[in-house]
Every structure is written in C-alpha cells, then in structure tokens.
Amino acid sequence: MARPLQSGGGKEVAGSKGVIKKVEFVRIIAKALYSLGYIKTGALLEEESGIPLHSSVVNVFMRQILEGNWDESIVTLHNIGLTDEKTIKSVSFLILEQKFLDLLDEEKVMDALKTLRTEITPLGADSSRVRELSSYFVSPSYCSSVRSPKQDTLRARSRSKLLEELQKLLPPTVMIPEGRLEHLVEQALVLQRDACMFHNSLDKEMSLYADHQCGRDQIPSQALQILQAHRDEVWFLKFSHNGRYLASSSNDQSAIIWEVLETGVSLKHKLSGHQKPLSSVSWSPDDHQLLTCGTEEVIRRWDVSSGECLHIYEKTGLGMVSCGWSPDGKWIFSGLNDKSICMWELDGKELECWKGQRTLKISDLEITGDGKQIISICREASILLLDREAKVERFIEEDQPITSFSLSRDNRFLLVNLANQEIRLWNIEDDLKLVSKYRGHKRTRFIIRSCFGGLDEAFIASGSEDSLVYLWHRGTGELIETLPGHSGAVNCVSWNPANPHMLASASDDRTIRIWGLNNLSTSMKQKEPHSNGIHYSNGGT
C-alpha cells in the first residue's frame, strides 16, 4: 500500500520543460512496470513515491471485478466519482452482461432472466446486444458450448478481459489505460521518424538511447552498376512487385528482363519481336508475366521464366499506346491511338471498350488495386479517373500539359509530371486534392517520368533532361539529392518496392544505372565489365 501523497512535498513536475506532471509520470511508470510483470518493483515504486497507481476505491472496484462480485462492483462504481451518466451506463452494462453469462454457466436460468429483465434492459443501452442475450434462453447450444472442466480458468480469463474493456470506458484519471507509457514512447519515435529527412530504414533499427536522425547514407546515391545491353535510348523501366526483376524498354524495339540478385543485376531475357520502339512495360500482379507495348503498335505478353511470347494483342487499323493488368491478373487493359481504352481476356478476346476522349496517343495507364478505377491522360491537361463499375468519371484538371503520371502503391495518390518542369502530388482517395509540388528537374522536350519510392514511399524520384536523377522528400517537398552519372537525358526512374535502398534510372545514353547505398558498393565497384553488357561502376561514366 502506498503512503498518502504529501501535498507540497518535492517538485510537482518532472523534466526540463516543466510540462510533465510528476504524479501522472510516476503512475504511468508504475502501470508499465506492472504490465511488464515487475510486480514487486511496481509496488515498491508506489510505496517509495507515496503515489498510488489507483485510488483505494478503484482498487476495491478492480478486485470486485476479478472476484466476480458483480452487485458490489455496481455499488462501488457509483462511488468512484464519475459524472458522465453515459459512461456509468456503459460500464454497468458490461458488468451486468458478465453477471448474466456467469449465471447461465451455473445453470441459474431464472436468476439470469431476472438480471436481464430488471437490471440490463432498464439501462437502455445496446438494444441489439440485449436481444442477442435473450436468444441464449432458446439456444441451449450456448450453455453446453461454454461448459468445460476448465470453467474456473475460463471465468478468470473472461474477468480479466472484462477489466480491460472497462478500462477503455473509464476516464484515464480513474484508471490508467493499458500500454500508456509504450504509446507515448512510440508516439515520440514516430514523430522523430517523420521529421527525419533521410529516414529510409526499418523502424526496428530505431533506438531509445538517442534522438533519431538518419544521414544521407540511407539514400541510394551511389551508382553500383551500369547496364549496357540496349542498343539505343532506354525509355522506360519498372521493377517487379516482388523486387526480384527489372524490366526495361527501348527505342531499339526490344525489352529486357533483368534479374536482381544479391551479387548484382544480371540480364535474364532479351525480348524481341516488336517492329517499333517500346513505350512501356507492365508486370502481372504475380510477376510471372510481362506486357510490352510498342509505340502505336501491338502489345505482347511474355512468360518471365522462359522469355517466351505467350500472346500478341492487336486491333485492325489501330495501334496500342499503353498497357496494364487487372489486379487479379485475369484481364489486361490497353489504350489505343483512337483515344479509346479496351479490356481484354488473356486469350485476346475483347471484353469491353470505352470509346471517346479516354486517352492520348502517348499515355500512361493505371488500374487501382481494387480493379474499379482506370486512370489515363484523356486530354492534354486532364487525367481521367474512370470508375468502370459505377460508370462515374472524375477528372484532375491541370493548368499545364501533362506528360506522365505514377500511382502510389496504396492507390491513394497520383504523381503527375507537367510540361512546366513541375511534379504535382494529388490525393485521389475521395475528393481530388492537390497535396504537394516538386520542382528543380529539367524538362523542355521529352517525356520525363517520376516515381514514389523508399520506405513507405517517403521519397519522390524523377528523371531529368540535364542527365541527373532528382530525389525529393515526399512530405516536405524539399530536394534532398541529385545523382550525376548519365550522359544523356534521364527518361524514367523506378524504385525497388522490396528494397528501399535500390533505385534504377534509364537514359538516352543507352544505359540503365542501378543506384544503392555507398556502403554497399565496395564489393561491386572493383569488378570488370561482364560479357553480357553489365558494367560495374563507382559512379563515374
């Protein structure tokens, strides 16, 4: 039993800022000690500080709950000092509900019925639950299902669970919430993490011993490899969902599937057969197949394991301009140069076609994870969000021509590249809302693509016509890094979704650069160029 708290004795606050009330602080620490199983230490803290964890009446109330003294606990509840009648009713309801269930367990059916009629129902709380309790009288399976040789143990557990539920209803000044100290510490860590400009590592690496602050070494800024297998400008690239592969497409009319290994990125398959430059690629949801789209030509579907072309999608007199998968992998979508969007079965059967001003000749195409929305650039400065089930169309209207866009992994945000050298972040979840803008990269003539990336997609990366890769902090919009190395315009970037420390960039200089952390490059940068067109680099050209 703790000694009574001495009024005016000692400091009433803790910490250098004078904002932590000592009594609350000690009580929260004691609560944490008890929760961690340090019962003697918690009791000793109460005794030495003279600050009890709970008042004597609350301790009596808790003991009555754990011992199943339901009628006494209701009386004590009214002596705790609660003023909110709604809280009193809610707490009383849970206590009497447990009393009712205990009586049924003991086969005291008439007593249970009396409790339901004269004590629970008059509270006027949770009528649907009252009806459910009433059904137990006509459903003998309930009683038989709860009886067991371990009935006393089960009751003790249910009473502990009840106490936890009551704790959520009672004011924190009466009964300190479970895990309150842990919640405050986690809250502080999350705030430090969110304020860290370069945070790009798992939270388990955060420490309580010092304020959290990552350095630039958490950002992929070192060119670990230069991939040189394409014979012309590399226009597009994309990591697979599992991060094990990278696909690239080029003006040389080919696509390449690269395999991401611990030792580096290596060429797996070179995909040939298109008669025009390839504008984009799209991974199937399971990463077993890949779509490649020729510029106003056809779409080809490939087996990733074998490199075999499984199907060619084409429409007489029309050319494809974009491609994408349904979330279940059963259909594909394509934009056509007559500005329509079509949906196909894998065998090539056309299922549906949305005609009219749905897409442009050079266009991105995305399908949200629930399969409901198709997103495309429908006019020079407009993006269409088409709900194909509800037949509802929404539009993002920009004041500049749109060159490309990228959908976030959680399908809530859209990154839009504009002709005026600006990237805009839109929230598309409910009402369309402009969230942030990113500036600094160069674009005057070409299609430059950007992407989300890093841990929790906390960063934005973009190509640029000045041969640099640009990196911004997503939340603040601050430019945090520019990566030199390419000798031509950087057309596209892709961040590995399974590795926040790996970034790829595609350039007019016919190369792909794999960027990683400085401390990872040591084992790779000294290697000689491979015969398959892969060159290892320490960042130079």
Show which residues each predicted segment covers:
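Eukaryotic adaptor/scaffold assembly regions
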Residues: 1-221, 527, 532, 538
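Canonical WD40 repeat/beta-propeller blade segments in eukaryotic WD-repeat proteins
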Residues: 232-238, 276-282, 318-324, 359-367, ...
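Conserved strand-to-loop turn within each blade of WD40 beta-propeller repeats
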Residues: 249-252, 293-296, 335-338, 377-380, ...
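A surface-exposed beta-alpha-beta supersecondary segment
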Residues: 216-217, 436-459
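Per-blade loop-tip surfaces of WD-repeat and WD-like beta-propellers in eukaryotic adaptors/scaffolds
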Residues: 212-222, 257-276, 296-320, 327-328, ...
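Loop/turn segments within WD40 beta-propeller blades
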Residues: 237-243, 282-287, 324-329, 366-371, ...
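Beta-strand-rich domains and repeat architectures in extracellular enzymes and scaffolds
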Residues: 228-246, 250-251
